[in-house]
């Protein structure tokens, strides 16, 4: 299980300072939509200069198939290590993205977003007319069959996804509160033990790390636990 630290701070300077504090740790860094729109592709280069971090660019691409493929191709030129697209874009979009990225000698991992961890059952059903688990199983089967590398999901769906695909089909699980911190805007949250028991391959932790007075110590504690 790998730790992915979310760089969801207010300024680029704060993000870079956090990255410097976490040098030489076996972690990934997650760059989200806010940071990417604010700081651009050069921010990725600056992070790589701090240390040879693995970068997950979390933009949740969702559009018509050709536009998604164009976007993923441009993102892949940045040298990031993992990207994500929305599973609800459908299998044609998945096929076009994976075909386009196949020309790269080293392409990023491509994960499909299933059900955002900000959803609870009631809100999810009001949109999709399905239970979360039913939709996630369907999304994961389609994603696996069309060559994606894994899914973004809550801890509660991670093991189920692997049961319906393969053990090596990756799961990245946001909403991790490692030591029982408050949920904030997440609905389906979990701790480290739950992530381990449900076979998560990547856990995403943000606020519990960067809001602590000693982020490196918290990261080291999490790494010891996993």
Curated annotation (Swiss-Prot):
GO terms (BP aspect): 'de novo' pyrimidine nucleobase biosynthetic process; 'de novo' UMP biosynthetic process
Gene3D superfamilies in the record: Aldolase class I (3.20.20.70)
InterPro entries for this protein: Aldolase_TIM (IPR013785), OMPdecase (IPR014732), OMPdecase_AS (IPR018089), OMPdecase_bac (IPR047596), OMPdeCOase_dom (IPR001754), RibuloseP-bd_barrel (IPR011060)
Lyase listed as a keyword: yes
Transmembrane segments: none
Protein EC: 4.1.1.23
Catalytically driven reaction(s): orotidine 5'-phosphate + H(+) = UMP + CO2
Function recorded in the entry: Catalyzes the decarboxylation of orotidine 5'-monophosphate (OMP) to uridine 5'-monophosphate (UMP).
Family as reported in the entry's similarity comment: Belongs to the OMP decarboxylase family. Type 1 subfamily.
Name by which UniProt lists this protein: Orotidine 5'-phosphate decarboxylase
Organism listed in the record: Campylobacter jejuni subsp. jejuni serotype O:23/36 (strain 81-176)
Gene that this sequence comes from: pyrF
